[in-house]
Swiss-Prot record:
<dbReference type="GO" id="GO:0033699">
    <property type="term" value="F:DNA 5'-adenosine monophosphate hydrolase activity"/>
</dbReference>
<dbReference type="Pfam" id="PF11969">
    <property type="entry name" value="DcpS_C"/>
</dbReference>
<feature type="domain" description="HIT">
    <location>
        <begin position="206"/>
        <end position="312"/>
    </location>
</feature>
<feature type="region of interest" description="Interaction with DNA substrate">
    <location>
        <begin position="294"/>
        <end position="295"/>
    </location>
</feature>
<feature type="active site" description="Tele-AMP-histidine intermediate">
    <location>
        <position position="299"/>
    </location>
</feature>
<feature type="site" description="Interaction with DNA substrate">
    <location>
        <position position="301"/>
    </location>
</feature>
<comment type="function">
    <text>DNA-binding protein involved in single-strand DNA break repair, double-strand DNA break repair and base excision repair. Resolves abortive DNA ligation intermediates formed either at base excision sites, or when DNA ligases attempt to repair non-ligatable breaks induced by reactive oxygen species. Catalyzes the release of adenylate groups covalently linked to 5'-phosphate termini, resulting in the production of 5'-phosphate termini that can be efficiently rejoined.</text>
</comment>
<dbReference type="InterPro" id="IPR011146">
    <property type="entry name" value="HIT-like"/>
</dbReference>
<dbReference type="GO" id="GO:0008270">
    <property type="term" value="F:zinc ion binding"/>
</dbReference>
<dbReference type="GO" id="GO:0000012">
    <property type="term" value="P:single strand break repair"/>
</dbReference>
<dbReference type="GO" id="GO:0003725">
    <property type="term" value="F:double-stranded RNA binding"/>
</dbReference>
<keyword id="KW-0238">DNA-binding</keyword>
<feature type="region of interest" description="Interaction with DNA substrate">
    <location>
        <begin position="231"/>
        <end position="235"/>
    </location>
</feature>
<dbReference type="InterPro" id="IPR041388">
    <property type="entry name" value="FHA_2"/>
</dbReference>
<feature type="site" description="Interaction with DNA substrate">
    <location>
        <position position="316"/>
    </location>
</feature>
<dbReference type="Pfam" id="PF17913">
    <property type="entry name" value="FHA_2"/>
</dbReference>
<dbReference type="GO" id="GO:0005654">
    <property type="term" value="C:nucleoplasm"/>
</dbReference>
Length: 380
């Protein structure tokens, strides 16, 4: 039991968790294992926004399982990957996920350090011994000799420790720790590090757009403010997404400061559509946002109204682009200009279950295949 206690204590000392600002606005903040840490509008984070409470979030790390429990204490919303954290409830934050401290602002991430070797069983560094050609005085030899004696003592201690640990090897692989070597914790951590190298980290699907923004096969164009990508699963013949380079999780986190950015996004989308319409004047386009964000990065859709695509398969796909669930980009801009914020449209999710009907003549359709055939021949 003493050995297990020492090893558990050693793991707490070697596996570290840190909170890091994505914009490097402050030094990394340590999150000790199983110790609640309060963050918010504090000098440590450099946050001065009054919408952020001084005690906005409570973070409790689990260094063994490598995740952090995030509890929202403040009145205003906080998000993990664009999904709101309910007040006084805890949500799980893992490595690679984005934590926005308040209202989609101040993005942070957590990361865990690797394990360090057990210094108690670590091999001692043997001092270089003098060669025959080296001239040493008797006083020099008297200084060197005690060091060699100390080394022997440490080796003997190591042998005693090894003899105590070896009987524990009969534990099964299902035990908390398997004592396979004189340094069980370091061996266990090395194996975990090797398995991590072999198996790539799988990010949550809601983070897919951030990876696509760096995929040269998907990127169409970019400038200092935005990136244009081809939709990986297009729902029409022409379907692009325009994303800001700033971390903005959804339209509900927009403010009047973002109006010029939204106008720029719309202008770029209209230019893309114009390039197509120069060659195919009959192609119709819409520019807009979904009422409720499903991804962790805000994006505007530029989509043609033919809806001819093999990726267009479900009623929810259809209703997300042909009902009020699809909000015109100009409406979002107008709401910010007149009211200073974007309307809360969370109740609009019910529109995704509306019966199928043609977006032109409004005639009900039986299923997706019949709807696609109807669109080809439908006239307003």
């Amino acid at each position: 039991m003493r050995i297990l206690y020492r090893l558990l204590k050693m793991a707490d000392d070697t596996v570290k968790c840190y909170l890091e600002c994505c914009k490097s606005s402050h030094p990394k903040l340590p999150l000790p294992h199983n110790v609640p840490v309060i963050i918010g509008r504090t000098p440590e984070l450099g946050i001065t926004d009054k919408l952020c409470s001084r005690s906005q979030l409570e973070l409790t790390s689990n260094c063994y399982k490598r995740y952090v429990l995030v509890k929202r204490l403040g009145a205003n919303t906080s998000q993990i990957n664009g999904i709101d954290i309910e007040k006084n409830k805890s949500s799980r934050l893992e490595e690679g996920q984005d934590l926005h401290v308040v209202n989609g602002k101040f993005p942070h991430r957590v990361y865990f350090t690797g394990c360090q070797n057990d210094t108690k069983t670590e091999k001692a560094v043997v001092p270089k011994l003098p060669t025959k050609s080296t001239d040493l005085t008797k006083s020099d030899l008297s200084i060197k000799q005690p060091e060699r004696k100390k080394l022997k003592v440490s080796e003997n201690k190591s042998k005693v420790l090894n003899s105590k640990i070896k009987p524990q090897e009969k534990f099964s692989s299902e035990s908390v720790y398997a004592f396979d070597s004189p340094s069980p914790m370091s061996s266990r951590c090395e194996k975990k590090a090797e398995s991590n190298k072999r198996a790539p980290t799988h990010k949550h699907w809601s983070q897919g757009l951030k990876a696509s923004m760096e995929d040269p096969e998907l990127v169409v164009k970019e400038d200092e403010q935005i990136v244009v990508i081809k939709d990986k699963y297009p729902k029409a013949k022409y379907h692009w997404l325009i994303l800001p380079k700033d971390s903005i999780s959804s339209t509900k986190n927009l403010s009047t400061d973002n109006i010029e950015l939204l106008k720029h996004i719309l202008k770029v989308g209209q230019e893309l559509a114009a390039e197509v319409k120069d060659k195919q004047p009959d192609v119709e386009f819409r520019f807009g946002y979904h009422a409720v964000a499903s991804m962790s990065q805000m994006h505007m859709h530029v989509i043609s109204q033919d809806f001819q695509s093999s990726s267009f398969k479900t009623k929810k796909h259809w209703n997300s682009f042909t009902t009020d669930y699809f909000v015109d980009a100009t409406d979002i801009i107008n709401e910010l200009e007149t009211g200073g914020k974007v309307k809360d449209r969370r109740t609009m999710t019910s529109l995704l279950n509306e019966p199928l009907k043609c977006h032109r003549c409004k005639k009900p359709q039986k299923n997706i295949p019949t709807l696609k055939k109807h669109i080809d021949s439908c006239q307003k």
